[in-house]
């Protein structure tokens, strides 16, 4: 199973808890995860955070490499400010982390007089402190680093809100043997470029009594001012899925189901 980030990342922690016997392979980017998962095995992608929204790069890589969603995993995120052993908060001049983590802790960081530097993943940022050997640089990552004597947890619970969760998708080309009820759907919808087209498409969901849980517009690359929609809805009946596709085919330019899956809370 491929994941983005270094050892100690949130993605790795999800996989260690869910699939402890699987081979886990770290990748530098979300695109690398999707490329590898399209050829061999599976990929885990963080898709949405409850504080800052959709992880666009991850979602787009899933779509680009035509991966299927097999499972949703929701994990509570507990960000901490971390430094080398002995580092004190008042001595910090720079804090590094993944851009998502910096966003999720923006209220806390705005109170500090420090430089913020984005890096490619949370755990990698912490591990890079070992190379700097500086007590003027801190990193934001998971609280599980308190088990490593090389580092010190300067402050815990620094997210903008205590209820901070991330949705992860397990993706790939070939379905794994997963037992969870497949009662959730994710899809891409492209409405016709005419007045009322989105309303017509949404009316189809209403007529079929489907509960929409996500609707988010994104620009279509190469088509300025045209938009696609990320759509999540609840359904466990494949016959209803087919009715939905048939009816939307009459009023929308494109509709594609990206996955039929269940959900697990960690």
Name each model feature, range by range.
Residues 1-266:
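Domain-level signature for soluble enzymes in the chorismate/prephenate branch of the shikimate pathway
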């Amino acid at each position: 199973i491929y994941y983005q980030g270094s050892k100690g990342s949130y993605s790795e922690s999800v996989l260690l808890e869910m699939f402890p016997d699987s081979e886990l392979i770290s990748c530098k980017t979300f695109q690398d995860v999707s490329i590898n998962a399209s050829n061999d095995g599976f990929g885990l992608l963080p898709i949405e955070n409850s504080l800052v929204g959709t992880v666009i790069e991850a979602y787009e890589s899933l779509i680009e490499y035509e991966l299927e969603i097999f499972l949703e995993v929701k994990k509570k995120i507990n960000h901490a400010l971390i430094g080398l052993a002995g580092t004190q908060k008042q001595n910090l001049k720079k804090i590094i982390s993944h851009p998502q983590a910096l966003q999720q802790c923006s209220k806390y960081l705005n109170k500090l007089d420090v430089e913020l530097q984005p890096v490619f993943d949370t755990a990698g940022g912490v591990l890079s402190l070992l190379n700097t050997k500086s007590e003027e640089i801190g990193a934001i990552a998971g609280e599980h680093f308190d088990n490593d004597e090389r580092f010190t947890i300067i402050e815990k619970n620094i997210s903008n809100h205590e209820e901070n969760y991330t949705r992860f998708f397990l993706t790939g080309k070939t379905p794994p043997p997963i037992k969870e009820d497949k009662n959730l759907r994710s899809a891409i919808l492209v409405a016709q470029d005419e007045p009322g087209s989105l309303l017509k498409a949404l009316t189809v969901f209403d007529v079929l009594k489907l509960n929409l849980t996500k609707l988010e517009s994104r620009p279509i690359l190469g088509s300025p001012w045209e938009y696609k929609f990320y759509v999540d809805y609840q359904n466990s009946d494949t016959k209803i899925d087919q009715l939905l596709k048939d009816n939307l085919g009459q009023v929308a330019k494109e509709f594609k189901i990206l996955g039929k899956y269940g959900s697990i809370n960690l």
